[in-house]
Amino acid sequence: MGSEMCIRDRGMGNEFLSNIREADAICQVTRCFADDDVTHVNGHVDPSDDIETITTELVLADLQTMEKQLPKLQKEAAIKKESRPKVEAWEQAKAVLEEGKTIFSAGLDPEPLHDLFLLTTKPFIYVFNCDQDQLADADFQAKMEKLVAPAEAIFLDAEFEAELAEMEPEDAAEFLADAGIEEPGLDKLARVGFDTLGLQTFLTAGEKESRAWTIHKGDTAPEAAGVIHTDFQKGFIKAQVVSFGDLVEFGGEKEAQAAGKLRLEGKEYVMQDGDVVEFRFNV
């Protein structure tokens, strides 16, 4: 979601808000760089103001929902005692919204609010599109991080990232080193996005193909097997597991096994990010 686009369009329409409701997280891209050839809709660049504008739109949309639904729940709670804890949770959330804050930033439990399909219960990620000077400005970054906390803040130069994406891996590594950048911004965005969504990766390796699979944090070995094929989950017996780090450190599967790093796990095993797995199953 681009801040300037929403400002230009004078707010978010119902269709746009509906699309956000279906999302699992909100990633807001905010312009920070100054460029006379790229006009900002407000005539000046102020990322703090842009973020406040979008936040206000989302908060007002949630308040509208809350003001419509809360009285109904309050009437229900007058008859059903079991509804009273939910009323308290909704009233607490409404108070946060009335302060102009998102429910996510207040750290409230989103579970009691699930039926409302609110926008600001979702986790937020902020991407600041900067120039190279801003990428080297620790004070500027600290200010932006404080502004959006507890959300994750990612700083990148989109033009730089576009050039990087066109390069061969060796040239890209040299380009990053010359710029004093340890990690491409898009790589960090992918990593933070995975973490924010509660996702992780495991790997399978065979003679014909090696591939990564996406699962949720906390998934067990049978659940991970089911991502590959439902038969793997139904007939799950064991999982042969080694971490990717150990595989690299010891130079291969046989070497990792000799070092005692290869193990068999059962149905209760909770998958870890970077596990390299061979599933044993019976159909």
Question: Which stretches of residues belong to each language-model region?
Answer:
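Conserved P-loop NTPase nucleotide-binding/switch module
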Residues: R8-G11, E15-L58
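Short loop/turn elements that form and flank the Walker-type P-loop nucleotide-binding site
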Residues: M1, I20-A23, L119-K122
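Extended, highly charged alpha-helical segments
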Residues: S48, T53-W90
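Short alpha-helical basic/polar micro-motif
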Residues: N14, S18, Q64, P222-E223, ...
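Short, small-residue-biased leader/transition segments that mark boundaries at the very start
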Residues: M1-I7
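Conserved nucleotide-binding/hydrolysis micro-motifs of P-loop NTPases
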Residues: S3, R31-D37, H44-D46, V59-L60, ...
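C-terminal-of-GTPase-core extension/linker across diverse P-loop GTPases
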Residues: K72-Q272, V277-V283
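Short, compositionally biased low-complexity segments
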Residues: T30-V38, L60-P71, L147-P150, E161-L164, ...
